Amino acid sequence: GQQINSKFIGAVFASALLLANLAAAEPQHGIAMYGDPALPHDFVSLPYANPNAPKGGTIVSAEGGTFTSLNPHVRKGSVPWQLRFLAYESLMGRSYDEPFTLYTLLAESIETDETRRWVEFSLHPEARFSDGSPVTVEDVIWSYETLGTIGHPRYHGLWKKIETLTQTGPRRVKFTFAAEDRELALLVGLRPILKKAQWETADFENSGLDIIPISSAPYVIRDFDPGNYVRLMRNPEYWGKDIGFRRGTNNFDEIRLDFYADGSVQFEAFKAGESSSFRELNAERWENSYDFDAVQTGKIVKSIIPHQRPSGITGFVMNTRKPKFADWRVREALIAAFNFEFINQANTGGRQERITSYFSNSVLSMEAGPAKGRVLEMLEPYADSLMPGTIEGYRLPQSDGSARNRKNIRAADALLSQAGWTVQNGLRRNVEGLPFEITVTLKQGDTESQSMMDIYQQALERLGITLTTEVLDSAQYKERTQVYDFDMAYYRRGLSLSPGNEQMLYWGSYGLEQPGTRNWMGMNAPAAEAMIAKLVSSSSREDFLAAAKALDRILTAGRYVIPIHTSSISRLAHIKEIKYPKRLPMYGDWIGFLPDVWWYEAP
C-alpha cells in the first residue's frame, strides 16, 4: 500500500505542476511586475478615466525651448517629449494607478510563464495604422530590430537582452530572453511600433522634420512650424477607441504645443489666454502671482493634484569625472555650503520641501539611521567600496536658516582642508597650487537656478572658491551635457515606483564614457549596479523594496548632487472649460494625465 500511495501522491503532484504551468501560460489581459493586475479582463476604463467624457475641443500647451525633429525614436535632434506618449503606441499600455502594471493595447493578449524567460503576444485583429493599413507581426519585429540597433540609445539595452524574436502565428510574436530578469516581459510591451513599409527607402536614423513616422496612435501630427508649434489632431478613425484601456481618454479633438523661449514668457502667454494650462513649480508664486483678472473672475481655476511618486533628484550635479569632485569630502563640503534653508526662504518664502533622498516621499525611500535587516544584508558584501554613511546612516547637512550658515561653512572648510584644498592668499588651492574654480552650466530661462547660484556664489567666496555660471540655449545645453562637458549643472531625474532596467542608464558605469546616458555625475559604483540587478531579478515584493532602499542609500550617501526642493503635489492652473476626473491616479500629474484623461466642456 505504501508504494502505491507515494506513486499516487507523485502523480497528483506532477499533474498539479502541469496545471500550474498551463495556468501561468494562458493568454492574459495584463501583466504586473508583482502579483496580478488590479483590473479584471473586461474592465470598462482605467479607474482614473471618465468613460463618459465628451469628445471635442482644443487644448493648447505652452512649452519651453524649441524642437528640431519630430522623430522621438532616434538620438538626433530635440523632440517635443509628449510625442512619444501621444503620437505612438505599443503592444501594451501602462496604468498609472498601479506601481507597474500593463494592459493589452496593440496586443489582444499576453502570455508568459512563472520564470518569465519568454513572452508571447497576440496582435489585436482590429489594430490599424493611421493610414488604414493593418499592424502586422512584421511591423513589430522590424520596429524592435531597428530601434534596438539604430534607434535612440534608450532602446539598445533591452535589445541586447532579447535572445530570439519570432513569428509564431499569423498574429503572434514571441520573445525569449538571454537573461533572468522579470522586468523584461513588461518592457517589451512598451516599445513603439512603427510601420516597416514607410522606411524601406527612407533614412530612419537621420530623419527629423522631413518624414513624420506613421503610427497607430489616437493622435496624428497635422502640421507644424519648426521651433514654434506642433498641432496634433485626434484620428476620427482611430482603431482602438472602444477598448477598455482607451475608453474615456484622448478626448480633445486637437492638441497644440506652442514653444516659448523661457518660463516667464510661457507664464505671460498663459495669463494672456494663449494657452490652456500652466504647471506652477514655484510655491511662492502660486500663493502670490495668481491674483490677475482671469483667476478673480473664475475663468482660470487653480487645481492641486497630489501624488505618491518618489521625489526623484533635482539639484546641481557634480561631475566626478573632473578630479576636483572625485573626493567625497569635497562634495560633502559643497553640499554643506549650499544654504538650502536660507535659499528656500529667499526664493519661495520657505514653502518648498527639500529632497532628502532619491526615492523620498515614497515606500522605496531609505529609512533614517543605520541599515537593518534585508537592506543591510544586501549592502554588507560591498561595505569596503561604499561611501561613509551608506550603512551607518546619512543625512543632508542642515543650516539654522541664517544667511551666514556658520556651522556648515566651518564644517565645509575642515572637509576641504582634509581633502588637500587649503586657503593660500585668500584662495582655496590644492597641493599643486591650482585654485578651486567651478563653472555651473544652466539652461537659458532658468531664472530660479540663477538666483540660487547668486546666493551660493557668496557662500563659496567665503571658502575661497570661485563660482561662475554659464547660460546656454537648450540645444547647446543638451549637446554639452550629453557628452558630460561641464563642472556642475542643473539636473533633474524623475523616478517611478517601479525602478528597474532604466536605472542602469541613470547610474551604470558604462555612462562614464558612453554619451547620452543620465549618469551625468560619472558614477562608478559596483554596489549600485548590484542593487539594480536585484531590483529586476527579485521575485518577491519584499526583496524588491529592500533593493530599492539599498540603492537609495548608495545614491544619497554618494553625495553626487546638491539637492533642492520637491513637492508631493502638482499645482496646475487651467482654463475652466477643461476638466479632469475626481478619481486621481497614484502617479498624479504625470505621463498619462494631462491631456490624456482631461476633456473640454463648453460653458
Could you tell me what each predicted segment is?
Residues 156-200, 216-225, 370-382:
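Surface-exposed binding/hinge segments that line
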Residues 28-30, 63-65, 79, 86, ...:
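Detector for C-terminal structural segments
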Residues 25-115, 122, 142-145, 214:
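N-terminal lobe/hinge region of extracytoplasmic solute-binding protein
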Residues 164-166, 222-233, 258-322, 329-333, ...:
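Extracellular/periplasmic solute-recognition and catalytic clefts
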Residues 88-100, 145, 189-256, 261-265, ...:
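Gly/Pro-rich hinge or "lid" segments in bacterial periplasmic/extracellular proteins
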Residues 49-54, 74-83, 109-153, 168, ...:
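Aromatic- and charge-enriched surface segment that lines or borders ligand/interaction sites
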Residues 124, 207, 240-290, 332, ...:
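Ligand-site clamp/hinge motif
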Residues 27, 45-46, 65-82, 106, ...:
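A structural "hinge/loop" feature
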